[in-house]
């Protein structure tokens, strides 16, 4: 889990807009962020397997 100070720092508006970065609102992870869903890949996988994300199905071929 991310440090609380880093999560709070990411919520503030930076001096320059380029410095803005996305964090997962559930766990605070800054990497592997999926913009379409607004969460990280780990939270996405767990929520998709639980069926909490509508329209997401596990693929098989």
From Swiss-Prot:
Pfam families in the record: Ribosomal_S14
Keyword line: Metal-binding, Ribonucleoprotein, Ribosomal protein, RNA-binding, rRNA-binding, Zinc
Textual note on the cofactor: Binds 1 zinc ion per subunit.
Binding positions for Zn(2+) per the UniProt entry: 24, 27, 40, 43
Gene Ontology biological process terms in this record: translation
Gene Ontology CC: one annotated term: small ribosomal subunit
Needed cofactors: Zn(2+)
UniProt keyword annotation of Manganese present: no
Keyword Metal-binding part of the UniProt annotation: yes
GO molecular function: rRNA binding; structural constituent of ribosome; zinc ion binding
Assembly behavior: Part of the 30S ribosomal subunit. Contacts proteins S3 and S10.
NCBIfam families for the chain: PRK08061.1
Task of the protein: Binds 16S rRNA, required for the assembly of 30S particles and may also be responsible for determining the conformation of the 16S rRNA at the A site.
Similarity section: Belongs to the universal ribosomal protein uS14 family. Zinc-binding uS14 subfamily.
Protein name: Small ribosomal subunit protein uS14
């Amino acid at each position: 889990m991310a440090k609380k100070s880093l999560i709070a720092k990411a919520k503030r508006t930076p001096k320059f807009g380029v410095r803005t970065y996305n964090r997962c609102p559930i766990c605070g992870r800054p990497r592997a962020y999926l913009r379409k869903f607004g969460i990280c890949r780990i939270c996405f996988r767990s929520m998709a397997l639980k069926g909490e994300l509508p329209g997401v199905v596990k693929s098989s071929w």
